[in-house]
Each structure stands twice: as C-alpha cells, then as structure tokens.
Amino acid sequence: MPSLAQQLSEQNAGARERIPTDTLAVMDAATDQVASSGLVDSAVGVGARAPEFTLPDAGGTKVALADLLTNGPVVLAFYRGGWCPYCNLELRALQAALPEIEAAGGTLVAISPELPDNSLSTKERLDLAFTVLSDVGNEVAERYGLVFTIPEALRAVYDGFGIDLPASNGDDSFRLPVPATYVLAPDGTVAWRFAHPDYTKRAEPADVIAALRAL
C-alpha cells in the first residue's frame, strides 16, 4: 500500500491538473499566507502541556482529554472537515493504522470544526472505528494555536467548489485549523507533533506509531 505522503501527492497532482491556473493562484497564495504568518511555529509544540478540552463526539457524547489520558498516550489529529479530500485520505490512513496505534498503547481521536451531524456523516462514510470530535467554533484548535481565517478570495473559490463551510461548521467565521497531529504522553505533555501550513501535507501514520513506541 502506498504511503500517505504518496497518496496525498497523487491527489494534489491530479487536482492541479484539473483546477484552472487563476484558481490555483488564489489557493497557493492563501497557503503562502498561512506559512508566512508563523502560525505553525507558534502553535503548541513538543514539551508543552496539551490544553485540556471536553468535546462532543459524532453521537453527541462528551469526551474529555483528561479521561482519555487515563488509558495511556493519546493521538490527536486535527483536520479541516469531511469535505476535504486530503483529510479523507488522512482519516482512511489512520483507520488502516489503527490496530498498530492501539497496539502501541495509543488512543486515536480526530477533531474538526464540523457540526456533530457532519462529523457523524464522515465517520460513517469512511467507516472509522476511532472517535471523531466536533470542535464547533474552533475553540480547542484555538487553544492549540492552529486556527486561521480563510481569505475572501479563497472563500469564493470554495463556493465554486460547492464547499459550504457555514453549513458544515455552523458559523460564518470561515476559520479552519491547520491540519496537525499530536502524540501526547500519559501525563498530558506533547511528545511529538506534526503541523504544516500546506494542507496537502499530513503526518505519516508510521511516524505516529514510532512516536508512540518511543514513549
């Protein structure tokens, strides 16, 4: 099976062949803006205490990070939403790696700003066996320092793609998290982190598993 990086690269190459040049320019400029903002560098990093949270899962049940940590290390995967093909590839790859993640002692949780009903749709569509949480309003992603606002020009592009963020997220803030993956030690400190301003780049599940095994 190809690595997640290979799958993401193929998805991106195909998209760039289909999408008009002027539209790509808008998308690339928005990614460059996130990169130049320094957001990723200032986000919660290795050695820091992971901000606590309690969020609803896809079924509406409240899930607290503190409770998850009582079972051992926790893997947090912040993603943009089920409308994002790169997120779907990442979630599928994490599902495929779930047995190894759990064998290494980890509890995997994915977090997006989507409403619980939309998170449930993503969970069912991708047949995910791990917990998917709804961070409506990006309050938790904000605590981790991962949130940015989508520029007006990119909003128009998303509209053209049929992506309705206000409907997905339940607000019109047009804010999203930078995709990021954290491995938390049982004491709640960040043992490993992957975050990238380019949303087509994601943590490789093998690296997540290696980080868990290194604890």
Task: List each model region and its residues.
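A generic structural motif
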Residues: 56-58, 184
